[in-house]
């Protein structure tokens, strides 16, 4: 009897200890459609919650994580239990047709139900890559956004930007400059034909576009004048302040312009602060002009060195970094001397409120390259010809790489293959990786085929339906193929 009482007492003690040490849990609730999330709907140009995919990522103190994807057809509702006192880092991302909006909350779990307050940013946190290709027809380009094709006819290379809603703006030139706008799903949303923005750019010699991802404002540079493009097509001009003509980028009311120098060697990089007062933009230069050298790459050939002057292609700003793309090629033509190459790279500058710091970091190229057999090879890890920035997310930026490779045959160099790739650059780890794409970008280089050397006509004719008689030369399969080639041409 005593043994039974002792055993029962032991069980009771162990059960009490188990209850004493057991963790208590609280429930977190994420309810974007019926809870405390910022309203998002199509009337603002943003996607409907009910029609969009939602990703939830929860990181705990022990660095373990919970990931949940809620499909567009499912309610945007999530619940899970966590130990009381746990510190959670909660990130949600709402995915539209070609862009995403995110929200973040740091939360300590309390007893009972924990409603998580998430304010989705009004500006897109990531923009899916824009695809585009040069078409078989001269001066025709095919853009692709959210699976929809957009045909553009332009006598000059079209320029484009994406705004904070994921909308696509394309400036192009037929006789005069024009501007089209498309929703993030590719639906046209053009300006009225009499909009001030259209009359402003029509006669310009050059046009560049930029969007501020922080403020959501869109800008156009027509020649050396900057204008803000309002949603209805109205414009806000600068008050007589000119800036260098060239690629532009805007970030948090800071304008960055890479000018084109009249003297080969350095292009001026300038930073301005933008102030909008009433109906006028005011530009104030921040810091000193930074000379960006065009002599980024030196080619070593037989002991001599030649520095090539590259062309600057595009500029992008994220947080406190400025990214600049450049490219240059020398293609094999009868009038062009060797060495032949298709090269490029990216520069990264840092800036602050005082201006740009002149200490660029270099990615995707080598300062010095060596020519062999009249060819300079970039290498798979490097750029062949970066064309422009095509998208970004919170960790990386995407770049269109548009170049070609070469091959030497029979004493002459020919274009061997087109290189159409997308480079992804991680802005934190500074790592680059590339992958192939079906997009042709701005250029599709002609892949020249080298025919086999011709045989004497007498020899070719003797092969065409007759017996070949070649004294001292073996009748190999190679000679047969060569003779067949010549027969077709006779």
Swiss-Prot record:
A lipid is attached at residue 17 (S-diacylglycerol cysteine). It comes from the Bacteria. A lipid is attached at residue 17 (N-palmitoyl cysteine). It is found in: Cell membrane. Residues 1-16 form the signal peptide. Keywords: Cell membrane, Lipoprotein, Membrane, Palmitate, Signal. Its main location: membrane. This is 53 kDa membrane antigen A. It comes from Treponema denticola. The gene is tdpA.
């Amino acid at each position: 009897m005593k043994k039974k009482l002792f055993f029962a007492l032991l069980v009771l003690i162990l059960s009490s200890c188990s209850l004493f040490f057991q963790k208590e849990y609280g429930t977190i609730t994420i309810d974007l459609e019926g809870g405390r999330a910022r309203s998002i709907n199509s009337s603002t140009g943003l996607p409907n919650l009910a029609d969009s995919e939602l990703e939830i990522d929860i990181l705990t103190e022990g660095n373990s994580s919970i990931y949940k994807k809620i499909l567009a057809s499912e309610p945007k509702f999530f619940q899970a239990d966590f130990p009381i006192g746990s510190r959670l880092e909660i990130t949600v991302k709402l995915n539209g047709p070609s862009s995403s909006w995110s929200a973040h909350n740091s939360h300590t779990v309390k007893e009972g139900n924990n409603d998580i307050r998430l304010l989705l940013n009004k500006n897109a946190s990531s923009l899916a890559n824009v695809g585009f290709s040069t078409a078989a027809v001269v001066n025709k380009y095919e853009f692709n956004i959210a699976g929809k094709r957009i045909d553009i006819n332009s006598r000059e290379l079209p320029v484009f930007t994406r705004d904070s809603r994921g909308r696509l703006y394309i400036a192009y030139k037929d006789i005069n400059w024009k501007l089209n706008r498309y929703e993030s799903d590719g639906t046209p949303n053009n300006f009225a034909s009499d909009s001030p923005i259209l009359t402003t750019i029509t006669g310009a010699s050059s046009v560049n576009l930029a969007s501020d991802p922080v403020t959501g404002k869109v800008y156009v540079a027509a020649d050396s004048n900057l204008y803000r493009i309002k949603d209805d097509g109205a414009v806000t001009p600068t008050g007589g302040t000119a800036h260098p003509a060239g690629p532009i980028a805007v970030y948090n009311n800071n304008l960055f312009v890479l000018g084109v120098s009249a003297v080969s060697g350095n292009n001026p990089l300038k930073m301005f602060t933008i102030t909008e007062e009433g109906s006028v933009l005011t530009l104030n230069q921040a810091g000193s002009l930074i000379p960006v050298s065009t002599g980024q790459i030196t080619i070593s050939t037989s002991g001599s060195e030649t520095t090539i002057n590259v062309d600057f292609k595009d500029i992008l700003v994220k947080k406190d970094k400025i990214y600049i793309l450049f490219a240059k090629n020398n293609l094999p033509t009868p009038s062009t001397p060797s060495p032949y190459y298709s090269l490029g790279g990216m520069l990264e500058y840092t800036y602050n409120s005082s201006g740009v710091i002149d200490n660029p970091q270099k990615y995707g190229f080598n300062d010095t390259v060596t020519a062999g057999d009249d060819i300079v090879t970039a290498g798979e890890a490097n750029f062949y010809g970066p064309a422009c920035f095509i998208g970004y997310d919170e960790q990386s930026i995407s770049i269109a790489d548009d170049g070609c490779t070469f091959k030497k045959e029979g004493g002459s160099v020919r274009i061997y293959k087109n290189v159409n790739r997308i480079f992804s650059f991680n802005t934190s780890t500074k790592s680059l990786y590339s992958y192939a794409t079906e997009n042709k970008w701005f250029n599709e280089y002609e892949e020249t085929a080298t025919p086999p050397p011709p045989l004497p006509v007498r020899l070719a004719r003797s092969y065409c339906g007759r017996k070949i008689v070649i004294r001292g030369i073996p009748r190999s399969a190679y000679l047969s193929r060569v003779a067949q080639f010549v027969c077709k041409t006779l």
